[in-house]
Amino acid sequence: MNRYNVYKNKFGTGYILDVQTDLLSGLNTRVVVPLLSISDSPKLAKYLNPTFEVKGQEVAMMTQFIAAIPESELTNQVDNLGDFHHEISSALDMIFSGF
């Protein structure tokens, strides 16, 4: 598994972003955040919900819906958002630290 890989959401609409460090690759779960199309997203909060383009669609990171799922559920990788490390880390800092 690679941090910041984006997978098709098998459980619903949009995508799933893997945000877990690769240093914990021995676990059988991954920490993930949903990526929803802007039209399907609740009101976006500055810093908490950065937006990205995935497969030509603008999506928002729904940081407030962070979860852990079995690693085996992450199949069908469609993208990697590693170039947006700062924005993703800032959103995670906002949910955990408030800044």
Task: Set out the residue ranges of the language-model regions.
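Residues at structural and domain junctions
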Residues: 2, 18, 74-78
